[in-house]
Amino acid sequence: MSRPPSRGSAPAPAPPARPRPPTPPGAGLRLASSPRNPALRLARALQAKKVRRERRLLVAEGEDLVDAALAHGVEPVALLIDAERVGADDPRVRATEGLRERYLVPPRLLAQASGLAAAPRVLAILPQPPVRSFRDVAFPPALGLYLAGVADPGNVGTLVRTAAGLGADWLALGPGSADAFHPRAVRAAMGATFAIPILEGVAPADLATRGGFAVVGAVPRGGVAPWEADLVRPLVLALGAERGGLGGALEELAAGREVVQVTIPQAPGAESLNVAAAGAALMAESVRQRARSGRSGSGTLSGR
């Protein structure tokens, strides 16, 4: 017969706590099995500029775009993933564990929500970058980009990507230019939508009233060669429609300041360059001149 423990003895140790099971990948994912799902309906509605403008949202289609947005710290409003081709262990699912609106979507429904010919594997609804004015950006710019009547969303998106990659301070959209948050523009920008300030609805007169910079306008003929122009000083590069050019916008931008017209030399009889290609060539020439002079642009490019 065992004796009872003495009054001074220590209590028996508590049994060790059971470890919590790890959270399974994709916990919290829901199945969107109906086209009436709110996130699917919103993704379809955001194909329209009016809805994008009212809601200040955009659609990113594909893994690369969603990854770029997440890398820039953008928090999605909703994440839609292909239930058959991706699954719950996708890294984008892990990166958005705190997001309530995450759905596994049958491919047929995901295709209906997308503007692509082939449905993406991942689609995210994202907040647009904040509305900006000239008070919010570097001014005068080392290099700013002004688009007047560039109506194709793909060209706008490509110019956003190029401007960000070549160190421009900002990109401003003038009258007649496509929405930089159009799905095609977002795809062409490949994540640069979140990397460079974008100013919307900037009339030439709004820019002309500001000082401290030169205007360099791209024209199809009659201008100086880009390497003959001073592209080192603070400047705004103005690009227009491929057919109509800058039109009257160049005169409005001048407003008493120096305006330099540049023309990229081409082979005889060749068609004019695509506006995105012309913009890339001119921005690259500005980078080259700055590198040779030892001056940097927005702090990311130096003479070396």
Describe every region a protein language model picked out.
Residues 62, 151-159, 271-277:
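Amphipathic alpha-helical repeat scaffolds
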Residues 124, 162-166, 177-194, 251-304:
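Structured adenosyl-cofactor binding patch, chiefly the S-adenosyl-L-methionine
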Residues 84-86, 107-109, 176-178, 201, ...:
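Short, acidic/turn-prone active-site loops that include or flank metal/cofactor-
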Residues 89-91, 113, 207, 226, ...:
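Short, charged, surface-exposed secondary-structure boundary motifs
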Residues 216-270:
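Active-site/ligand-binding-proximal alpha/beta "capping" segment
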Residues 96-97, 122, 188-192, 233-235:
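Short, hinge-like loop/turn segments at secondary-structure boundaries
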Residues 2-153, 176, 287, 294-304:
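Arg/Lys-rich RNA-binding interfaces used to dock onto structured RNA substrates
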